[in-house]
């Protein structure tokens, strides 16, 4: 915030200093400060550690709501070469950083960095595209963090024994993981599909290749979590909170999961009907 304010003051004083201040350099400092506030690479160093110390609801705010203002300001600056560097680093670091994580909050943090790379790439194309992407990403993140918050899940080994007799909840949780990763035909594929179409029209094939490869890596560690949790034998965890399966929170989660899994079909049907 200090860097952002300082560079803004420099930009305002530019005319009073006989143009001795380079405007593009000042804009680059402002852009770097905004990327730092949003948690984009290479200014992401604070984001996973901050996520690890937050509750799930506060982590959700950090992953979604706190990104709106920086991204809106970035869309007005739109320094393409700096955005391009941040997009490439964000999708790569977000994918590779989540490979060996055992903490669910850090896993979601690196997933957020990867998705932020997709949102920044959509900023280079159209403001409406990134708003659509941000809306779907926020919804899918809310579904997962809502469930993690209900059952107090913070580490992967808790998933292995989590509600061993409730295969439905386990199955829906992992379907939401795959939807967040952008696997078709789930809802999370729709915003990625829009970005892929627009990047193809702009002939950004190399950038698109890197982004799709990073998505495959994120899907790999999501699938690894799913496979391990379904194949591991049951063992007792004293910190697992027992809950009544027929509760309002669980019912709300199942309703949101329905839209997460079948939302793409419903949107496609609505589009072809009207």
Swiss-Prot record:
Q: Which residues cross the membrane?
A: 28-48, 54-74, 79-99, 107-127, 128-148, 171-191, 206-226, 254-274
Q: Phosphoprotein: present as a keyword of the record?
A: no
UniProt KW keywords = Electron transport, Membrane, Mitochondrion, Mitochondrion inner membrane, NAD, Respiratory chain, Translocase, Transmembrane, Transmembrane helix, Transport, Ubiquinone
Q: What GO annotations for molecular function exist for this entry? A: NADH dehydrogenase (ubiquinone) activity
Say which domain of life the source belongs to: Eukaryota
Q: Which Enzyme Commission number(s) are listed?
A: 7.1.1.2
- Main enzyme class: translocase
Subcellular location(s) per record: Mitochondrion inner membrane
**Keyword Zinc-finger included in the entry's annotation:** no
Annotated protein name in UniProt: NADH-ubiquinone oxidoreductase chain 2
Q: Which gene encodes it?
A: mt:ND2
């Amino acid at each position: 915030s200090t860097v952002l304010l300082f560079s803004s003051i420099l930009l305002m004083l530019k005319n009073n200093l006989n143009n001795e201040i380079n405007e593009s350099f000042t804009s680059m400092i402002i852009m770097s400060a905004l990327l730092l506030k949003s948690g984009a690479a290479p200014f992401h160093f604070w984001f996973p550690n901050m996520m690890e110390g937050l509750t799930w609801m506060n982590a959700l705010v950090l992953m979604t709501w706190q990104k709106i203002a920086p991204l809106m300001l970035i869309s007005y600056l739109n320094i393409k070469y700096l955005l391009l560097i941040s997009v490439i680093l964000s999708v790569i670091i977000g994918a590779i950083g989540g490979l060996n994580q055992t903490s669910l909050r850090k896993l979601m943090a690196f997933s957020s960095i990867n998705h932020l790379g997709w949102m920044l790439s959509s900023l280079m194309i159209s403001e409406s595209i990134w708003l659509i992407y941000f809306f779907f990403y926020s919804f899918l993140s809310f579904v997962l963090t809502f469930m993690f918050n209900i059952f107090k899940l913070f580490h992967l080994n808790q998933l292995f024994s989590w509600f061993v007799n409730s295969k439905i909840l386990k199955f829906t949780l992992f379907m939401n993981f795959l939807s967040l990763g952008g696997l078709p035909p789930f809802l999370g594929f729709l915003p990625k599909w829009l970005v892929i179409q627009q990047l193809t029209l702009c002939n950004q094939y190399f950038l698109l290749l890197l982004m799709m490869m990073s998505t495959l890596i994120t899907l790999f560690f999501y699938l690894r979590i799913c496979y391990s949790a379904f194949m591991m034998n049951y063992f007792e965890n004293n910190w697992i909170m027992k809950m009544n399966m027929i509760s309002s929170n669980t019912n709300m989660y199942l309703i949101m999961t329905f839209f997460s899994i079948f939302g793409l079909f419903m949107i496609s049907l609505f589009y072809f009907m009207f």
